Amino acid sequence: MEHDLTHGNVLKTIAVFALPYMLSYFLQMLYGMADLYMMGQFSGAAGITAVGNGAQTLYIITVTLVGLAMGTTVIVGHAVGSRRFDRAETAIGNTITLFMGVSVVLAAVLLALCPQIVALIGTPPEAVEGTAAYLRICFVGIPFIAAYNILSAIFRGLGDSRSPMYVIGVACTINIALDFLFIGHMGLGPVGAALGTVTAQTASVALALVWLKSRRTNIHVMRSDLRPQPEVLSSILKIGVPVAVQDGCIQVAFMFITVIANHRGLVDAAAVGLVEKMISFLFIVPSSMGATVSALTAQNAGAGKGNRARQVLKDAMTISVVHGCLITVLMWLVAPAFIGFFAKDAAVVAAGTGYMRSYIFDAIFAGIHICFSGFFAAYGKSYIGFAHNVLAVALIRVPGAWLLSNAYSDTLFPMGIASPCGSMLSAVICVIAFTVLNRRGAFDKLVA
């Protein structure tokens, strides 16, 4: 099941790895969009806001866990690249032990704090009940959400991006079917959306485990590999914690933006909730390129192929920037129709169009720093990604959105500019960091 990513044409290797990952990401976004579509058809602005706020909160938790799992992807990738499968087995076993413990504790804490979380994000009164119900159900499912994303991280470290695609395809089908049942037929609203999401994630974990056991591989995780080993856990956390914190900070910034929008009223709150969900969908390519760069670079770094690793970064970044330019032009042309497909309320469509047309420029600049962050993480330098993201959030994304929202109360267009400006700062920092480290030969060999 493991795949050698250290040979062959770089661009072709990127495409072969990235395309299944993109499809997996698309399918994950699809059933998130299905939730919003069904809520828009059967529930109205209050339901959209409840699911939008709840999904944004859950996404913070999910991406933080995924970021932490980056340590596993990189360590497993290093081991596969150097053909040390015993190290990969130990890393996988320790990851399972670590994340299952963390996810159970996290679920319990979040359930206890659910009312406070709903209040903290400034949920409009009309959407409080629905948001709380959505979050309680999703918090119960956190161990399953964590398990799926951990398994995906392990697959990527092994160079396999296809297996998660097959698994998530089944989960997506289940989720969409349940949305029609729970939201459309039974009228359960946000509760139905949450039940569909958690049930689909649970099914995906079960299927992934069955798939993993059925595949022939050089990796055989034994019970002894589950025993925590401080050195292994330290290696995983050294890479994963900065990535988790940086991803968490980005999502917290989005949550602050959601809070700002919530204080503007129900229409703007619904518009921002819709656009944020759509942006996740439109960012499939740069997000996929970031994961692709980390997986390919990890194996090539483990194999001592620094030049090939740098070529991976260059090609992936080119793909991301070209995509960003194309999608920006497209959204300027079709934003009203695109948003109108998910919302019938004309006021929500108008507000969302303005927000989308400024926010979408982020697709260009985010593609640059996401690829750099994946590259830095693969070389054990994930602290760089942490630093530039925290600076962008603290200096531009949040304060910029707040200031522009207050200055322009009649439109969301200026508020949307804050995100691409934050990504511009991140991109500049990444270019400087790469140039300095590359001149010092930091990417010529792997330093564990």
Go through the PLM ranges and name each one.
Residues 33-36, 108, 150-154, 173-181, ...:
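Alpha-helical transmembrane segments of multipass membrane proteins
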Residues 69, 137-156, 164-172, 193-208, ...:
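Short runs within selected transmembrane alpha-helices of multi-pass transporters and secretion channels
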Residues 16-35, 137, 171, 200-204, ...:
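Transmembrane helical elements of multi-pass membrane transporters/channels
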Residues 48-108, 145-164, 258, 271-335, ...:
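Small-residue-rich hydrophobic transmembrane alpha-helices
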Residues 26, 30-49, 118-125, 181-188, ...:
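Helix-terminus/linker motif at the lipid-water interface of multi-pass membrane proteins
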Residues 43-56, 135, 194, 266-281, ...:
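Small-residue hotspots at the loop-to-helix junctions and early N-terminal turns
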